[in-house]
């Protein structure tokens, strides 16, 4: 049976019914997949230590190919985990700490 975009699932938690939209669920899965990867976790840790960095800074520090670093940064950007800021010809990457806090709260709630 093919699910429609507007279809929802009802979850029960503590006597409460929670409506969960499948499209929202798919988006959440993409975000969780983005941060559940060893290399991307290393990038997140590096950005946390350094505030903002260029892709060149990142691939040199982590000893990666430039294309690999760019690909993983793009995944993190699409997930809303990193922000970009252009300064001249350089693009600086930084963490969206508010977004990471949201993800952390969600994971804690799901795990608990």
Protein language model annotation of sequence segments:
Residues 73-74:
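Short, hydrophobic-biased segments on the C-terminal half of alpha helices
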Residues 106-107:
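Residue-level signal for well-ordered alpha-helical positions
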Residues 60, 77-78:
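Alpha-helical residues within the helix-turn-helix
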Residues 1-35, 81:
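N-terminal leader segment of winged-helix/HTH proteins
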Residues 23-67, 87, 91-98:
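N-terminal helix-turn-helix DNA-binding core of bacterial DNA-binding proteins
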Residues 52, 80-81:
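Short hinge/loop at the helix->beta-strand junction immediately C-terminal to the helix-turn-helix recognition helix
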């Amino acid at each position: 049976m093919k699910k429609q975009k507007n279809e929802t699932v009802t979850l029960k938690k503590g006597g409460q019914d929670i409506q969960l939209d499948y499209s929202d669920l798919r988006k959440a899965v993409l975000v969780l997949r983005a941060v559940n990867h060893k290399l991307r976790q290393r990038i997140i840790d590096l950005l946390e230590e350094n505030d903002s960095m260029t892709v060149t800074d990142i691939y040199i520090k982590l000893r990666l190919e430039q294309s690999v670093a760019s690909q993983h940064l793009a995944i993190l950007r699409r997930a809303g985990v990193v922000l970009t800021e252009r300064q001249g010809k350089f693009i600086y990457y930084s963490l969206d700490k508010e977004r990471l806090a949201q993800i952390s709260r969600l994971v804690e709630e799901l795990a608990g």
